[in-house]
Structure formats: C-alpha cells, structure tokens
Amino acid sequence: MLEFIENNESTIRVGFFLGILMLMWLWETLSPRRTLSVSRLFRWINNLGLVVLNTILLRIIFPAAAVGMAVMAQQNGWGLVSILDWNPLLIIIFSIIVLDFMIWLQHVAVHAIPAFWRLHRVHHADRDYDTTTGLRFHPLEILLSMVIKFIVIIALGPPVVAVILFEVILNGMAMFNHGNVRLPLPLDKVLRILFVTPDMHRVHHSVEDDEANSNFGFNLSIWDRLFGTYVDQPRAGHDAMTIGINGFEEKNEVNRIDGMLLLPFKAKMNGYVINRRSWK
C-alpha cells in the first residue's frame, strides 16, 4: 500500500482534489450555511484560475516540490526521524502531526509578520466564504509556504508517504473547513474536539480583529486550544457576521484574478496584523 501511494502520488492527489471539490460543490448547493453576496460562478472561475496559476508556477520553480525534498531527505538520512527507532506506521503518524503543527505555526506567522500578512490578505479578502476560499492564495505566499515546507522536511526527515498523505489531507481539509456548508450543531461540536470544522474556521475569516486572529488550524483543532487562540463562535453569529477585510470591498479588487495578484501591493498596512491590532 505504501509503495502504491509513493508510485501514484500525482494521480492520488489530483483524484482527491477533484473528488472533494465536486463533493463540496454539491454539498454547498444542497445545504448552504450562508447566502453568498457574489456570483458563485464568477468567484469560482477566478479563485480556481489562481490555483491553476500557482500550480504552473510551482512546477516551474520547484518541480520536485515537497515530495521531492522528502525523497532527498530520506536518501541522505536527514532529520529527526532518521534517528528514531519506531514502528513505521507510528513514524508516519508522528510526521503528519508535526507537519500539521508547523502549518499552524506558519499560519500564525503570516498574520504576525507585516510583509507576510500583505500576501495572506489575498486569502482573507474574499467577501464570501466557500470551498474555493480555501484554495486562493497569492503566488508569492505559495512559494513562501513551499520554502518553509522544505526547511521543515529537512529538519524532520519524514517518510515520503507521510508527506504525500499530509498534502492530500491538508488540501482536502482546506476545502472542507472553508465550505459554505451546514453541519448539524451536535456533529460540529463532536468533530471540532479534534478537527477543524467549517463553523470553527469561519470565525477566522471575520473582519473583527480578535476573531480573525484566532482558529488558525487547518486540520487539527488541538493547536488553537493548546495555545489559547481558540474562539468557539463569532459574536455576531454565523449568519450575520461580516467576512473579509475592512477596506477591501471592491469586487474587482478582491474577486477578480488580476485584482488578487495586485492586492498585496495596494494600501498601507492597517491594524489587522497580530502585533499591531487592537483587541476588543
């Protein structure tokens, strides 16, 4: 099974991506959580167009990507995992958990460091919130994220299959927890004990400073609970809360691909970054 995953990485990743995207589209159509303010077709064309651009850019600059770095680390015996005499399955689980924590930490960093926040604003400027929001990131942030991932992989030395599984899980969970979908509240309450749910992560996309700087997790909810950044519900409620960034309301700027590409270079920094915000 592990060998099959390694040998069919691209097929597995593309298959899961398209499958989950279509499932989320169907779920959002049948059971939406909120009424969207912008045409879904317009947003999907532009958000997914940005995904295509990012994919091409990554293939040009980092053709081997994270999996290639994991292969190199394994071949050269780099990282913590190389000195651990553990069961292979335990090492895979451990590696996925460590990678998830590092993604959480990276997410905190892009809110805390002004230059990084400029890039991350593209993700938060979406005035609606659906599964494609979880995929829209500025190309420079995608490249930054890959460099950070390389450093983590070199230090950790995770099995190749762990990196593949993590990438599939991260992509799928990002689409799930950004979904404009309605979960039964009892189910949401149980799921978010361990995992990030759409209602939990939606709080993070609030225009309110303290809410936007909470719930940083993409996969596991435990990091926000452990480090005191967990917020249960938005003050205004999910139906009435405002999503996006104050000062970024113009449709073409926040929803059209050319506007998204230019957005980091527009406007002065405001008080929205963690280390410059005013708490309420």
Regions found by a protein language model. Give the residues of each.
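Cytosolic-facing loops and C-terminal tails of multi-pass membrane proteins
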Residues: 236-280
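Structural signature of hydrophobic alpha-helical transmembrane segments
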Residues: 12-22
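Short, strongly hydrophobic alpha-helical membrane anchors
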Residues: 1-10
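Loop-to-helix transition at the N-terminal end of transmembrane alpha-helices
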Residues: 12-13, 38-52
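Membrane-embedded catalytic scaffold of the fatty acid hydroxylase/desaturase
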Residues: 52-65, 80-81, 86-240
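Membrane-helix interface motif
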Residues: 63-74
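Membrane-interface helix-loop junction between the first two transmembrane segments
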Residues: 25-44
